[in-house]
Amino acid sequence: MLSEVEFTEFQKENFSLLIDVRSPREFLHSHLIGALNFYALNDEEYQEIGMIYKKNQALAKARGASYICQNTAKHILEITQNFRIGEKVGIYCSRGGLRSKSIAVILSELGFRVVRLKGGFKAYRTFVTHYFENEINFDFFTLCGNTSCGKTELLEQLPQAINLEKIANHLGSSFGDILGKQPTQKAFEAELFHNMQNLENFAFIESESRKIGDIILPLKFYEKMQKAFKIYCFCSLENRVKRIQKIYQEKMTPLKFQQCVQKISPYISLNLRQDLLQGYERKEWQKLIVTLLEYYDKTYKKPDKIDLELNTDDILKAKEELLDHFKVQLLFFNIR
């Protein structure tokens, strides 16, 4: 069985397998969450067919069909070894054209229940873009407070939570670029959209600037965050230092530290810059961290309106206190 539906229906389906048939490079740039890449054309083939198409469309289609047949043969073998005939399979390509149709027809003939995404990945991106461009029907409860007061640690303990730093693969400050390569903007938005679709219409979230490393939060999303219920988190300096040391000490390299200090150099004195670099070289971790916290505390702007204050020295205790405060909302949605 083979059908084709709009994304609004496609996202409601419960697929045993979701296939992205675009080239590996396209897939890595961004894809539907949960999709596997069974490409119709690999990167080199896709580029070759594109160049031929500009000169001879008939030849491009013939050459492309040949490549698709070769690649599909390998993919079909892997799919039938890992999934039962009769299971539901979702499939999409770039615009809902030949690449997805060719593999979809074969899987359907084998007995899989195949659903194609009408308009392909382009239709999905249009849907996601419009979703974030419009007023978001979502309530946020925002954890704010000074650096390293346990906001992220608390967030990871909460139900109905969106961890923006995790999705962006960045810790959010000038020193936050220690986790490796960030996703593309499209991949970030795909993951954020997926997170929001799997929650009720509210979420706990950490206060962030609009820019997290190279990622930019969608404007309507950011504006909604700014208007959210504010939970001000605070804890002792001792615990803040411990948390910073736990997160950064193993991941921070000498070169990366120099680069991070360079980012804040326009805002600090030459003496402070030298103190930071020497502190790292001498491994005077606690003194170094306290110095950095003093810098960040001066730059932090406390919200004008705070709806709840929360001591986060003990994260589990803070979690229970917070959940107790929101028990009515959580009970309404049967969330524990």
Q: Model-derived features: where do they sit?
A:
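Glycine-rich phosphate-binding P-loop
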Residues: 99, 139-159
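Positively charged, proline/Ser/Thr-rich regional signature most characteristic
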Residues: 12-83
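Long, charge-dense
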Residues: 116-129, 245, 257-260
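Conserved NTP phosphate-binding and transfer environment spanning the P-loop NTPase/kinase superfamily
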Residues: 224-230, 234-336
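Phosphate-binding P-loop
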Residues: 83, 131-138
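Conserved nucleotide-sensing/catalytic segment adjacent to the nucleotide-binding pocket
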Residues: 159-224
